[in-house]
Amino acid sequence: MNKRSKKKDLKEKAKKETVEWVKALIYAVVAVVIIRLFVFQTMMVPTESMFPTIVPKDRLFVETITYQAREPEHGEIVVFWTPFVDKEAQKMLRPFDHFMNAFSPKEFDGHVMYVKRLVGQPGDEIELVRTEGNNGYSVLVNGETPDKLAGIEYSKAGIFTDPQFYRKMAYPDEYPGLSAQQEKFFEYYNSALDYRSAYKRVYDSMAVSEYAWYDEERDHVKLKVPDNCYFFMGDNSNHSFDSRYFGFVPEKNIVGGPLLIFWPFNHFGTVNSDLPADTEEP
C-alpha cells in the first residue's frame, strides 16, 4: 500500500469515526429530550429555604409522573413553577438550566421552579399558632398539625400578619399608610416579579374574605386554600420566600417531586421528605 492510499484510508477512518460521534451525540440529545419531556425535569436550588434537606446550589432530578396520577400530600416536598415571572431568579440560571427549561410549556416562559413543602390542599383552612416552649409557630391544617409538618417552626409573616397582604403586594400605591419597610419590600418584589399580573389571574375573581380573614376569637389570621390551588412553605422559615408572601400556587404549576440530588457530588443522594432534625440556618 502506497503512502497516498494509506493517507486516504486514515482520512476515511477519521471521517467515519466523526460521523459515529455525531450520531451518538444526536442520539444522546434525543434521549435527554424524551426523558425531559415525559419523565424528569431538572432544577438548581438558589436559596436556603429548604435547609438542611436541600442546600443552595444543589441540582435536583425532579420526577414528573407521580402527581399526574395523584394529589400531593401534606408535608411532601414539591417542585412547582412560580405563579409569576421572576426576573431576578432568571439571572441566576445557567445555560444548562435554560436549555432544559426550553422544553417547558410556553405559559411558564420567564417563570422559575421553586421547591417547598406542601402545607395546604384545596379547601384546607390554615393557621399558625404559638405553642408552649417554641420560639416559632406551628401550623394547623383544618385544626390539626399533619404528622409530616409537626416538627417545623414557622415565622408569622406575610399573609399571616394581614389578610390584605397579597393585595397590598400587588397594588401598594393604593395603600398610603404603608411603613417604609413595607414600601421597600413591595417595591422590590413588584420590580423583580411580575406579581400584579399573577394576582389578577388568581384573585381578581374573588373577595379577600374568601381566602383570608382575621379570626377574632383565635386572635390571628386564618386562610382557606381556593379550589385548584395549593399552599407551600419552606422548612427554613425565616429564609423562605413562599406562599406566605406570594400566595397560592395553581395546580397546573406543579412539576413533581425531587427525587435525587445529582450535583455537587458530595451531596449526591436521594431527597428525603422526612423532617430534618434541625431547620436552623447553617
Explain the meaning of each model-derived region.
Residues L10-A14, V30, M43:
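Enrichment for repetitive, rod-forming helical segments
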